[in-house]
Curated annotation (Swiss-Prot):
Gene3D superfamilies: P-loop containing nucleotide triphosphate hydrolases. GTP binds at residues 10-17, 57-61, 115-118. The gene is CDC42. A lipid is attached at C188 (S-geranylgeranyl cysteine). The modification Cysteine methyl ester is found at C188. GO terms for cellular component: cellular bud neck; cellular bud tip; fungal-type vacuole membrane; incipient cellular bud site; mating projection tip; nuclear membrane; plasma membrane; septin ring. The keyword Ribonucleoprotein does not apply. This is Cell division control protein 42. It is a lipid-anchor. Belongs to the small GTPase superfamily. Rho family. CDC42 subfamily. CDD domains: Cdc42 (cd01874). One of its GO terms (molecular function) is GTPase activity. GO terms for biological process: actin filament organization; budding cell apical bud growth; budding cell isotropic bud growth; conjugation with cellular fusion; endocytosis; establishment of cell polarity; invasive growth in response to glucose limitation; nuclear membrane organization.
């Protein structure tokens, strides 16, 4: 049985662990426990073939910046996560996570994953964001961002309601099995 390695990265508290636990157990975890490093495995059928999907959870906190890349070797696909109700975590996809992943694993496919979409319509969350002159990230913003960063795709989900959750991992599997061909830009040479 072939194994696919999927590593999940993103800021602390954006829902990476909940995403993985909800997907692998069909239950939303009750408590928040910051992750240092964890991994999970699920068997998925793709056509008639069984695959083991190895899911690697990582710590988003800066304290683990030197430790986290130790989980990167042999990765088949990255899920770069942010919370749709945390614009700073969205910015960090571009400022921190994409550069880190591409530095350590150039050419490995990446999906951008918007998490916590159930909170996008939450009145208390919206009011809190408005007090900071912020608003939730829209699907259109996520899709545009994915194009700009040349990610494979933008997907979003809620680990709480499981809306879009299976699709995130289905798309990750497709990206791992059929990585997109990276078009090299033509370099200008002056003689």
């Amino acid at each position: 049985m072939q194994t696919l390695k999927c590593v999940v990265v993103g800021d602390g508290a954006v829902g990476k662990t909940c995403l993985l636990i909800s997907y692998t157990t069909n239950q939303f975890p009750a408590d928040y426990v910051p992750t240092v490093f964890d991994n999970y495995a699920v068997t998925v059928m793709i056509g008639d073939e069984p695959y083991t999907l190895g899911l690697f959870d990582t710590a988003g906190q800066e304290d683990y910046d030197r430790l986290r890349p130790l989980s990167y070797p042999s990765t088949d696909v990255f899920l770069v996560c942010f919370s749709v109700v945390s614009p700073p975590s969205f910015e960090n996809v571009k400022e921190k996570w994409f550069p880190e992943v591409h530095h350590h694993c150039p050419g490995v496919p990446c999906l951008i994953v918007g998490t916590q979409i159930d909170l996008r319509e939450n009145k208390m969350v919206i009011e809190k964001l408005q007090r900071q002159r912020l608003r939730p990230i829209t699907p259109e913003q996520g899709e545009k961002f994915a194009r700009e960063l040349r990610a494979v795709k933008y997907v979003e989900c809620s680990a709480l309601t499981q809306r879009g959750l299976k699709n995130v991992f289905d798309e990750a599997i497709v990206a791992a099995l059929e990585p997109p061909v990276i078009k090299k830009s033509k370099k200008c040479t002056i003689l």
